[in-house]
C-alpha cells in the first residue's frame, strides 16, 4: 500500500494545502465511498452537495469549493487532473514482469538493456532490441529486429511483429497485435493474390494502446502512430494509417487503410473511418461516427440517428425510404407554383 502525506502529495500535484499537511492518505476513492485514509476530488460543482457527508481525509477541489469542504483540502485549478496525478502517486498496479524469467526465450543476438524484465514464456527473436527499463509480460512475442523503447511496458500476450518500432514510455495492454499483415490483395480474374506487406509500424513515445487492438503493418510505407496518442480496446488500425500526436481514439473504432488523422483529434467509440482520406488537426468525431470523406476544417462532427423508441425508429426508417419519392413530389409542386 502506498502512503503519502498531503504536503508531499501537494508538491507532486503543484497544489495548495488547506488544513493539516501531515495527514497521510493511502488510496483514491469516490466521494460517496471515501473514508479515513482516502483522498477524493470534486471537478463538477453539481456534486458539491456531497461534500457535506464526505468522509475522506482530503478532497481535491477548486478554490471556489473550499468553503463547502468538511475535511482537509488540496486546491487546484483542475481537480480532475489532480485526481489523475494523485492516482499515479498512489498506484499499486503490479509490474508486467519483475525479472528475466528462466522460461523466456531470448535469441543470442537480441540486445537486452539494463534493468529489463521479461516474463515467463515470452519470446524475443533475433536482433530484437529491448531498451533499458522495458518490461515484457508473460507470453509476449517480440519479432526479429523489432525495437522496444526505454521504460515501455507490454502486458501479457502482446505480439510485436518483425521490424516494428515502439518508442519510450509506452504502455500496451494484453492481447494486442502490432505489425500483422495489412489487408492487401490483388484480384486475378476472381482469384485473390496476396500482396506481401513490406512496411512496418512505427510508434512514438508515451503512446498507450488498449487490449485486443490490432495495428497492421504498411503495404510499402509504414503505419505511423505519433507520440502521446491514446488508443482504446478492440480497435482496428489498417495498413499505412497515420495518427497525429495527441490524438485519442475510443473503443471499437475501425480506421481503413492509408487514412491520415491529424494531431489532437478525438475519435468517439464505434466510429468507422473510410480509407484513403485525410482528417485535419483538432477534429472531434462523436461516437458511432461514419466518416466517408475527408475533413479539412477542425470542429465536432456527428452522424447516425440518435436513440429512439423502436416504434419511433421504425417510422423514421420508413420515411427515409420514401425520401426520393417525396423529393419528386415536392419538385412537381414547386414547378406548378412557378408555372
From Swiss-Prot:
Alphabetically ordered keywords of this record: Acyltransferase, Lipid A biosynthesis, Lipid biosynthesis, Lipid metabolism, Repeat, Transferase
Keyword Lipid metabolism on entry: yes
Catalysed reactions, semicolon-separated: a UDP-3-O-[(3R)-3-hydroxyacyl]-alpha-D-glucosamine + a (3R)-hydroxyacyl-[ACP] = a UDP-2-N,3-O-bis[(3R)-3-hydroxyacyl]-alpha-D-glucosamine + holo-[ACP] + H(+)
EC number(s) from the headed UniProt entry: 2.3.1.191
Domain of life: Bacteria
Any Gene Ontology CC annotation: membrane
Record bears the keyword Acyltransferase: yes
Pathway assignment: Bacterial outer membrane biogenesis; LPS lipid A biosynthesis
GO molecular function: N-acyltransferase activity
UniProt xrefs under PANTHER family: UDP-3-O-ACYLGLUCOSAMINE N-ACYLTRANSFERASE (PTHR43378), UDP-3-O-ACYLGLUCOSAMINE N-ACYLTRANSFERASE 1, MITOCHONDRIAL-RELATED (PTHR43378:SF2)
Function of the molecule: Catalyzes the N-acylation of UDP-3-O-acylglucosamine using 3-hydroxyacyl-ACP as the acyl donor. Is involved in the biosynthesis of lipid A, a phosphorylated glycolipid that anchors the lipopolysaccharide to the outer membrane of the cell.
Entry similarity comment: Belongs to the transferase hexapeptide repeat family. LpxD subfamily.
Protein name: UDP-3-O-acylglucosamine N-acyltransferase
Lineage, broadest ranks: Bacteria, Pseudomonadati, Pseudomonadota, Gammaproteobacteria, Vibrionales
Gene expressing this chain: lpxD
Amino acid at each position: 500500500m502506498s502512503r503519502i502525506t498531503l504536503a508531499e502529495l501537494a508538491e507532486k500535484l503543484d497544489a495548495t494545502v488547506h488544513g493539516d499537511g501531515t495527514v497521510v492518505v493511502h488510496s483514491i476513492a469516490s466521494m460517496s465511498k471515501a473514508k479515513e485514509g482516502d483522498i477524493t476530488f470534486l471537478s463538477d460543482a453539481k456534486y458539491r452537495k456531497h461534500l457535506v457527508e464526505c468522509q475522506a481525509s482530503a478532497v481535491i477541489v477548486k478554490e471556489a469549493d473550499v468553503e463547502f469542504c468538511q475535511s482537509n483540502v488540496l486546491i487546484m485549478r483542475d481537480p480532475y487532473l489532480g485526481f489523475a496525478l494523485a492516482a499515479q502517486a498512489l498506484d499499486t498496479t503490479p509490474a508486467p514482469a519483475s525479472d528475466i524469467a528462466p522460461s523466456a526465450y531470448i535469441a543470442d543476438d537480441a540486445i537486452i538493456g539494463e534493468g529489463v524484465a521479461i516474463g515467463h514464456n515470452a519470446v524475443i527473436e533475433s536482433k530484437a532490441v529491448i531498451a533499458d527499463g522495458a518490461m515484457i509480460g508473460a507470453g509476449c512475442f517480440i519479432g526479429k529486429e523489432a525495437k522496444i523503447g526505454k521504460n515501455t511496458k507490454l502486458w501479457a500476450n502482446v505480439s510485436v511483429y518483425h521490424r516494428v518500432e515502439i518508442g519510450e514510455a509506452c504502455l500496451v495492454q494484453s492481447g494486442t497485435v502490432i505489425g500483422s499483415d495489412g489487408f492487401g490483395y490483388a484480384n486475378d480474374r476472381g482469384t485473390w493474390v496476396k500482396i506481401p506487406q513490406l512496411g512496418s509500424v512505427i510508434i512514438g513515445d508515451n503512446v498507450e494502446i488498449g487490449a485486443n487492438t490490432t495495428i497492421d503493418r504498411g503495404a510499402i510505407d509504414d503505419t505511423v502512430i505519433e507520440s502521446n496518442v491514446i488508443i482504446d480496446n478492440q480497435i482496428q488500425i489498417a495498413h499505412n494509417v497515420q495518427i497525429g500526436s495527441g490524438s485519442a481514439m475510443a473503443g471499437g473504432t475501425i480506421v481503413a487503410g492509408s487514412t491520415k488523422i491529424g494531431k489532437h483529434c478525438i475519435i468517439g467509440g464505434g466510429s468507422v473511418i473510410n480509407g484513403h482520406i485525410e482528417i485535419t488537426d483538432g477534429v472531434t468525431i462523436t461516437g458511432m461516427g461514419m466518416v466517408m470523406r475527408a475533413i479539412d476544417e477542425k470542429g465536432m462532427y456527428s452522424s447516425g440517428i440518435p436513440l429512439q423508441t423502436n416504434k419511433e425508429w421504425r417510422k423514421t426508417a420508413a420515411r427515409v425510404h420514401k425520401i426520393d419519392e417525396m423529393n419528386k413530389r415536392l419538385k412537381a409542386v414547386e414547378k406548378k407554383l412557378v408555372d
